[in-house]
């Protein structure tokens, strides 16, 4: 939900900035066209793709805009850049890219298409954020902390563990926050929960 709201706010801001928009193909009615490129997953993956697409759909619905998504043919930087280019060539001037896997493609696209507004989620673009790019990152450790406290309060005692998705910074930060939340509950809220930090 937090990511969906953040994406909606960025799209609304971009809409206000680019309201004069593109006059090229697909923008016949002067509407900003919102596109999204998925990573290797689908738009119903209950993760990055789905959250991003729900934000794009909600923005399109609330602002009366056109939206679509493309699933690239593969998972390389070239595949992602090709999908971004395909959307751009069809008149999409605002494109959301969910996840760190898009970092290199976004760095290239922001230079290739200066009139394209790009949002990348969960990557701060160490190579540099262009003036037409917004990089959204979250404080996963804070959410993990709350989940750790809630877990400890729910079970009160015994053993708990954490199973994340990929071994990536966002999941690692959530895990660290989760462990700290369990430790906080043990020290301050009367729980006695054991957690093996390696899991």
State the predicted function of each range.
Residues 1-32:
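Short, low-complexity disordered leader/linker segments with a strong preference
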Residues 20-199:
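A residue-level marker of the well-folded mature domains of exported/periplasmic proteins
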């Amino acid at each position: 939900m937090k990511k969906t709201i953040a994406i909606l706010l960025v799209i609304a801001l971009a809409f206000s900035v680019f309201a004069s928009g593109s006059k090229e193909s697909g923008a016949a009615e002067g509407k900003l066209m919102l596109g999204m490129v998925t990573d290797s997953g689908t738009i119903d993956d209950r993760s990055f793709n789905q959250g991003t697409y729900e934000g794009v759909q909600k923005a399109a619905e609330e602002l009366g805009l056109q939206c679509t998504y493309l699933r690239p043919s593969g998972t390389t930087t070239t595949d992602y850049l090709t999908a971004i280019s395909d959307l751009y060539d069809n008149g999409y001037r605002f494109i959301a890219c969910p996840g760190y896997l898009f970092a290199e493609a976004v760095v290239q696209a922001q230079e290739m298409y200066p009139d394209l507004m790009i949002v990348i989620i969960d990557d701060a673009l160490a190579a540099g954020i262009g003036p037409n790019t917004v990089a959204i990152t979250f404080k996963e450790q804070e959410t993990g902390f709350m989940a750790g406290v809630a877990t400890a309060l729910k079970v009160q005692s015994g053993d708990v563990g954490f199973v994340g998705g990929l071994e990536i910074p966002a999941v690692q930060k959530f895990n660290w926050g989760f462990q700290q939340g369990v430790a906080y509950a043990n020290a301050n809220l009367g729980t006695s929960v054991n957690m093996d930090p390696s899991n």
